């Protein structure tokens, strides 16, 4: 396994970060570095807001400057959670252009890149009532219909497959059974299975006590490099937080 993991994503990555860190540490040892650009509702190309917190688009964050600054190291990159921009009303072509930009930037530091698609089967099995419920909770400003979202998601999935083939990325199809009542967030009981598969490691590699709730809480509370709270910008330099069980983490 590589010495450095670079992960891009949104809510699923926020929820699965403790598992991802534990799996990376189990596979690569206690010196592994994890750099993650993530956040609830995170957009690849636009500013995103969750409650009172605002984050720049992944393409606009400080991760890319940090990758240029750090010395070269064997790296695996993960591009995940690419569907939020559909819910924000961006077209399939715009969404794919942002993902392509991210992939091309990552290819400057590694050719080991995993790209996940969208859980289209989970979306398609939604009833109209459930769709309206989740839309009102997750993206209350969205006015797209279920049919429109499913059609755009299908176009994005086709584009992701073409991008993976053209750029030599490893495309990972998200499993339908990873999702339950919530159509876009992986079930908590399957975080370990899902994120180990996305990372490319075995689920049995994580020691029983390695993915502790204390570390998970600490990771959840760590601030990203640049964010706004109630309109006030907050900058937190990311020199790398050392974790007690091993590994260093930088968040953007």
Question: Where are each of the predicted segments found?
Answer:
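Conserved SGNH/GDSL esterase-like catalytic core that processes O-acyl groups on lipids
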Residues: 2-97, 242
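Alpha-helical cap/lid subdomain in secreted, periplasmic
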Residues: 60-189, 193-197, 201-206, 211, ...
């Amino acid at each position: 396994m590589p010495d450095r993991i670079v992960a891009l994503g949104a809510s699923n990555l926020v929820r699965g970060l403790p598992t991802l860190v534990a799996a990376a540490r189990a596979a690569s040892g206690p010196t592994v570095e994890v750099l993650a650009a993530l956040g609830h509702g995170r957009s690849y190309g636009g500013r995103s807001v969750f409650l009172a917190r605002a984050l720049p688009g992944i393409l606009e964050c400080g991760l890319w400057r940090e990758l240029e600054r750090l010395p070269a190291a064997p790296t695996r990159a993960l591009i995940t959670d690419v569907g939020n921009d559909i819910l924000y009303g961006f077209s399939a072509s715009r969404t794919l252009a942002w993902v392509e930009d991210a992939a091309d930037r990552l290819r400057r530091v590694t050719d080991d890149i995993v790209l996940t698609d969208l859980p289209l089967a989970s979306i398609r099995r939604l009833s109209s009532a459930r769709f309206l419920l989740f839309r009102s909770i997750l993206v209350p400003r969205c006015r797209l219909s279920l049919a429109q979202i499913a059609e755009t998601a299908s176009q994005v999935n086709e584009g992701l497959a073409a991008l993976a083939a053209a750029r030599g990325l490893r495309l990972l199809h998200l499993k339908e059974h990873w999702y339950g009542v919530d159509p876009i967030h992986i079930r908590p009981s399957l975080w370990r299975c899902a994120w180990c598969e996305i990372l490319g490691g075995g689920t049995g590699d994580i020691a029983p006590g390695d993915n502790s709730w204390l570390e998970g809480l600490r990771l959840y509370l760590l601030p990203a490099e640049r964010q706004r709270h109630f309109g006030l910008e907050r900058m937190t330099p990311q020199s790398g937080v050392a974790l007690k069980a091993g590994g260093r983490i930088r968040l953007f």
